[in-house]
């Protein structure tokens, strides 16, 4: 499927954080965006202000419009009238993750994966890239404080995305660089066992080709076997180690690999240093930080 010929698009569950980021992308492209959600919210209000036409009634009235594509979130109820209608329609119907995969297919994709920290690390990477002169785009799983949005529009071919393991959504992506923060026992309702979770992550990591790069936390070192290059970050071992840590009530400072350069972070706690280290590791690996 190609997105170049789309003039109108319907989002089922448009108020969700991931769906609304996609909607903002298409609005910025000048495409007519329509949406359904169960209830109004700050996000649907913001999308309406941008030009989206949104309904909160799950009935046939919405189907009076003709759409080139319908995108839905897996969170849509199975008995939704609109979801069932478009499942039986000839109009292309795809999941949110599939739409994200199509959008980023021909970009240099930095995919942030892991059980924790994806939104924070993705936001930090996008901010770092922008500050270093790379006008990236980003699809975030939360509203970034620095950008006041969950979608960041850029002019370069670099895009930062969250690679969500839920429902194996990350398998739709074509990553060039992957950040892996952690692998924990989450989503057992989908995967059943930790072994299945690890297997799914490894399948995603192996979507990297021979020149792809994986940057991962030292905590998951025993579970990683992939093609391409690897860089490790953490506190004890690896290519990028946080050293000289100082944690204060309102901020933290640290260096990398015992260098004289000191990084100041406006948050305290080792986990925030770890997130910042992941983002800086991307910059160092790309030769921009």
What are these regions (language model features)?
Residues 25-31, 48, 61-63, 74-216, ...:
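Phosphate-binding loop of NTP-binding sites
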